[in-house]
Amino acid sequence: MNQNCRNSVEIAKTSINIVDNKSSFYRLGYHGEKPKFVFTENEEKVLNDIIFSCIQSGFDKKDIAILSLKSNNHLQGWINSHSLLYQTTTDIFDNDRILATSSRRFKGLESEVVIVVGVEKDDFADVIKKANMYVAASRAKKDLYFIINNNICSIDDIAALSNSAPGFSKKGIVSTHYQVKVQDDV
């Protein structure tokens, strides 16, 4: 394959850099939003804020997928505490619900917006976990978010663990309290 047809150059580059792949096929795709890494102590609040922002931007609920790097059980607490309607199966898609599932179950599928939850420091260091994170990230077509509990993993942790991946560093990633911002490249 010599052209990326699923996602933007920015999403493809981030996905590839997670697994330290030196591929450059992503340069042939279209340009879009930069993926956003959100460091927070309140993952549920940020998740709701991102979903609300996506819906306000014109995405339908069916266009949003919440992918856990852990099992579906990891999502259950969040699903029970939110007023949004979620579905946890990929067998039947419901236009009025946001899909919440594990990245492993979502392999081979895609979504306009992917929100990756349950990210921990080990996910950037372990080869198998990086492959799982690549699967989650590469499912996004237009917008990609990583929600990271800053009590578990900091931006410096990720930068240190990702030294071998070209272009993947803390440069350009800014997180603020409940808001997502991405700096322009310097």
Segments from the language model and where they lie:
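The feature marks helicase ATPase cores and/or their adjacent C-terminal helical subdomains
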Residues: 1-186
